[in-house]
Swiss-Prot record:
<feature type="compositionally biased region" description="Low complexity">
    <location>
        <begin position="293"/>
        <end position="302"/>
    </location>
</feature>
<feature type="region of interest" description="Disordered">
    <location>
        <begin position="445"/>
        <end position="464"/>
    </location>
</feature>
<feature type="compositionally biased region" description="Basic residues">
    <location>
        <begin position="303"/>
        <end position="318"/>
    </location>
</feature>
<dbReference type="Pfam" id="PF15504">
    <property type="entry name" value="DUF4647"/>
</dbReference>
<feature type="compositionally biased region" description="Acidic residues">
    <location>
        <begin position="445"/>
        <end position="454"/>
    </location>
</feature>
<dbReference type="InterPro" id="IPR029134">
    <property type="entry name" value="DUF4647"/>
</dbReference>
<protein>
    <recommendedName>
        <fullName>Uncharacterized protein C9orf43 homolog</fullName>
    </recommendedName>
</protein>
<feature type="compositionally biased region" description="Polar residues">
    <location>
        <begin position="352"/>
        <end position="367"/>
    </location>
</feature>
<feature type="region of interest" description="Disordered">
    <location>
        <begin position="290"/>
        <end position="374"/>
    </location>
</feature>
Length: 464
């Protein structure tokens, strides 16, 4: 590989073992390819340049700045010739103009006006013939009518369509001509004036009277016998046709603004039109929830009223029972327990035994509701070992004074009933529970718990 001397190279590299400079890597690649950058002849400085003194040159700025400059045609080729063709990067784009610069044809071309179609103005009659000299006329094609989605509504014509019908042009033949100067319209070469279509005489009176409000008709037609409208009515009809509607949804019958505003006010007063469907659903849900809440509160109040009445009745029964019990316990009652047949009573005393069983059932239900039994299986086993054989219980009549307080009598009866229930539980542990009795006991406990919960829930809002 023939390389020039290193003194002619225009390359620099750092002396580090591990170099991270991209410029150093680029110089290494150029040297490996055998294309190092070489110093140009213009860059060479003479050896005795340091001995010479600096020179100052004066230039006339007016000659260089204000002189007319012409754009050179070969600016791109000159700039490319200054570059070194040895580099591989620039050799790829040799012969191709850069994308950023415009083409020669675009540089040399002058600003040209777009070609416009010429209208023969000799055949047409212009409104102002004096201004025709410096005027450019543009032809606008006919606009296609856009059909609305809703077929029920009547389609209103645009301003361009109105101007076409005013000039009396056919649908496909004609085209509207517009001049760039404001307020100038050029009619077609063969205009047909049909102004009779827009006069109020052309329309029948019944069609005009239905479209107008009644108050306006009373003012314009004081005599109902007139067949043709007066001059004032013609003027007002023309003005109403020219005015655009206030809204797109305005009905055709509401021509006057007062009538439209009254219709709009009526629609706002109706709640069905004021609220959309989504708000209606939310409103219905809220009202239903409020009604349900009121019903639930009424039911709870009724329960609160019922529960104290039940309690009062139970207290009255408890007070009335001690007297009957004291009278019923005059005769001694003997109850014998047999492990095979259970409780047995002696003959002739069945009535007294029935009363005693009713009292036992009442006391056991009260104890279950207030004091829930918390006895485990081990406790039952202990009682099973302590019990020994059948036992005989004898309840003798209490010959106490009737004038004693009722509370003492109730306490004595409660103590006796506790003893009876305790012995009964021991015997049932020995013999084993029956499945039907277990179910009855569970059902009684659940009913008592439900009543207590309802009563506690009813008392909470009263306390608050």
């Amino acid at each position: 590989m023939d390389l020039p001397d290193e003194s002619q190279w225009d390359e620099t590299t750092c002396g580090f073992a591990v170099c991270q400079h991209p410029q150093c890597w680029a110089t290494v690649r150029r040297i490996e390819r055998g294309r190092p950058r070489i110093l140009g002849s213009t860059c060479k400085t003479p050896l005795d340049a340091e001995d010479k003194l600096p020179v100052l040159t004066v230039v006339n700025i007016s000659d260089s700045c204000f002189a007319p400059r012409h754009l050179p045609e070969c600016t791109v080729t000159k700039a490319r010739s200054l570059l070194s063709r040895s580099s591989k990067f620039y050799s790829k784009f040799h012969g191709r103009p850069p994308k950023g610069l415009p083409d020669k044809s675009l540089i040399n071309c002058t600003n040209r006006l777009p070609k416009l179609p010429v209208l023969n103005l000799n055949e047409t009659q212009l409104p102002c013939p004096e201004d025709v000299r410096n005027m450019v006329v543009l032809w606008i094609p006919e606009e296609t009518e856009i059909h609305g989605r809703q077929h029920g509504k009547k389609k209103r014509k645009n301003l361009t369509v109105k101007s076409k019908s005013f000039l009396g042009l056919s649908g496909n033949q004609s085209a509207v001509t517009r001049v760039e100067t404001p307020g100038m319209t050029v009619p077609p070469p063969t205009p047909v004036q049909l102004s009779k279509q827009f006069s109020s005489d052309f329309l029948p009176l019944w069609a005009q009277s239905e479209a107008l409000p009644q108050d306006l008709l009373k003012e314009l037609l004081p005599d109902r016998k007139q067949t043709m409208p007066c001059l004032e009515m013609k003027i007002k009809l023309a003005m109403m046709k020219k005015n655009l509607p206030l809204e797109r949804n305005r009905p055709d019958s509401a021509i006057s603004s007062k009538m439209f505003l009254s219709i709009h006010r009526l629609t706002l007063e109706r709640p069905a039109l004021r609220y959309p469907e989504r708000l209606k659903k939310l409103h219905n849900l809220k009202t239903e929830g409020y009604r349900k809440q009121q019903q639930w509160q009424q039911q709870q109040q009724q329960r609160k009223v019922k529960t104290p009445i039940k309690k009062q009745e139970a207290k009255k029964k408890a007070k009335s029972d001690p007297g009957s019990q004291s009278t019923s316990h005059k005769h001694p009652v003997t109850t014998v327990h047999d492990p095979l047949y259970g409780y047995r009573t002696l003959p002739g005393q069945n009535g007294d035994m029935k009363q005693q069983q009713q009292m036992e059932k009442g006391t056991t239900s009260k104890q279950d509701s207030t004091e829930r039994p918390k006895m485990d299986y081990c406790d039952h086993v202990d009682f099973h070992h302590n019990v020994k054989g059948p036992e005989l219980y004898e309840t003798e009549p209490t010959n106490k004074d009737i004038s004693a307080p009722v509370e003492a009598v109730l306490k004595a009866q409660a103590a006796r009933q506790k003893k009876i229930s305790f012995n009964f539980s021991e015997i049932m542990v020995r013999t084993g529970w029956n499945s039907e009795l277990k179910l009855l006991r569970i059902l009684q406990e659940t009913d008592d718990e439900d009543e207590e919960n309802q009563y506690s829930e009813a008392e909470k809002p009263l306390e608050e």
